[in-house]
Each structure stands twice: as C-alpha cells, then as structure tokens.
Amino acid sequence: EQLIAQFNVLKFENELILLKGARKFSFEKITAQLIGQTHATVLEVNLNALINNLNVYKNYLPKETGVIAMVKAFSYGSGSTEVASLLEKQHIDYLAVAYADEGVALRKDGIQTKIMVMNPDAVDFDRMQEYHLEPEIYSLQILQQLIEKIGQQEMNVHIKLETGMNRLGFVESEQEELIAVLHQHKNIHVKTVFSHLAASEDEQLDSFTKEQISIFKRLSETFVASFNYPIKKHLLNSSGILRFPEAHYDYVRLGIGLYGVDSSATIQEKLLPIGKLKTRVSQIKQVPKGETIGYSRKGVAEKDIKIGILAIGYADGYDRRFGNGTGEVFIAGQRAKIIGNICMDMCMADITHIDGVNDGDE
C-alpha cells in the first residue's frame, strides 16, 4: 500500500520490472498501477517499421554514403528521444533538428550521436557549444554572430549554399567573403557543405532539379578546394535518393521517408507506416431516420443507422476537417465514415454496415 501511494512520485518508462513474492503481498495491485492507461487514445509508433524504412533507403545508397536522419519536430510527431535512440543503435551518422532546444533535450536524454541544428538562433550558440551541437551557418550575419559568441573556442559547423530553393543559404556572390572569414577564424571547423532541392519529387521539374545539382557541384567544389582539410557534401532529401543517384555525395538527408512516406511508387511500396492512432468505442447508439448527430446538427441520419461514439477529438489531434464524411476510421477491420462534426474529445462514426462492434472495442 505504501508503494502504491508513492507511484505519483515514481517514474517508470521503458523498464523491465520483475514482481516476485507471495500472493499475500497483492502484487496484482502494483501490476495494475504499472500498466494502467488513463486515456483510451494513443499514438502507437512501430520502431521496427522505422528500421525497415531506414534499410529500404540504405539499399539504394553506395556503402560510402552516410545518412543524416531528421528528428526535428518531435521526430515528425513520433517521439524525439525514442526515435533518436533507435537510430543511434543503427549507427546513424548524424541526427538533425530544427532548433537548439531539440538538440539539448536529446543530449540530456543521453543521445551521443552528432547533432546538426538546421535553424540556429544566435542566442543559442552558448548552449550549442555546451551540448556539442553543430549549427548550420547560412549567412554572413549569423557567422559573425557565432564568431562574437564563441571567441576562440572551437566549434563544428555546416555551411548551407543557396542553389534555387530561395530559403536559407549563402548566395554565390557571398562565397568569396565567406571563405575569407572562415580562413581568419580557424577555430570554426566546417564539417559539411550542403544545399536543399526544391522539387526532387516532381518529374515535371527535373530540369530545375538538375540545374540545382549542377550549381551545387560547382559551388561546393570551389568551396571545398579552398580548405586544407576534408569537408563532406550532402544535397539529397528522401525523394531524391532514388531519382538522382549522381548526387548521393557523402551523405543523404532522410526526413519524411524515414517515417513511411515517399513520392516514388517504387520506394513507397517497400515502406511501412510507423504510426497508428488508436482509440476505443465509448458507446454504440441506434439513430432513427431523420435525427441529427453532433454539434450544429451537421450529421443527419438519412435512414436508421448505427453509430459508434469514439473517444478521440480535435484535442487529440484528430482535425475538425475530418468531420461530416471526410474522415474515416477502421473498426473491426472495416472503414467507417465520420458523421457530424468532430468534437473536442469525441467523434461519431457510422458503423451501420459493421457487425459485432461492442462498447470498449479498439
């Protein structure tokens, strides 16, 4: 009883726990506490599927080409530390985050793999230095801010070049000054030079993509030749890996493909979805013809129907735009359309055509 009373201050996560003792100790109460789930709605992430997806892409790469895995935005909503830890065990070359605080959180959780920060802020350079994070440098201004912040301390950086995306990156006219500044500050070590393709998935824009590849080849060769130490290159994102093998370079950046989505049918058929959003049927109701369902009476029973009230709503991330027949769910292995508006914590599905559904079913 004392142990159960203290569960609110004890934290267990991903632990293997052995409960051993006589029946009189009522260990079943402890088991119930450990496995208890307070919310019927969960996002289940299949890490084995993620490994499959990683290997699918690796099969298209030469052995000497490494992988930079994007784990920004909570690993595309899949769990930052969990995904990063798995990728670390797969000996990934680099992890990439959008902001420094994402990288700091991974370091605090024990991740030791090299981490690239793709959208650094000058106010975070101290923390990046402390936690061994490597910022992307994309302008002379951000480079100067880094120099002022770190003084003579050493720091690894990644230089981004503009090749046609018109997002972050040094334009060609800045390259000479960039090289000169880096030569003056030898404590700043360039680990990679890279750019980003704007339309690698779109065959109709292949001429533009090939022009980007050509520009990157020219600019990166000039840049790398200006230093007396090795600097690696990367250009391709997930959708470019299959389509532009001539641009594999030293690394590729795996983003959404790692999580199961690719524009190429050849690759997509080999990928596995890693996420499954699950909930339970709270109640089943018979709704007579002519009655309405949900807010604003948007759902209308055109005939006698059976609905399932589900324990998921827009507060759980199930977008309100999925209401009124737009969204579907799987119940008992069959598709069921959402009827009526999505509520904050609930929604309703038309299960008239599905037999054997009971309260509490997944």
Tell me what each language-model feature is:
Residues 1-52, 100:
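ATP-dependent carboxylate-amine ligase
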Residues 6-7, 29-30, 80, 107, ...:
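Short, well-ordered secondary-structure micro-motifs
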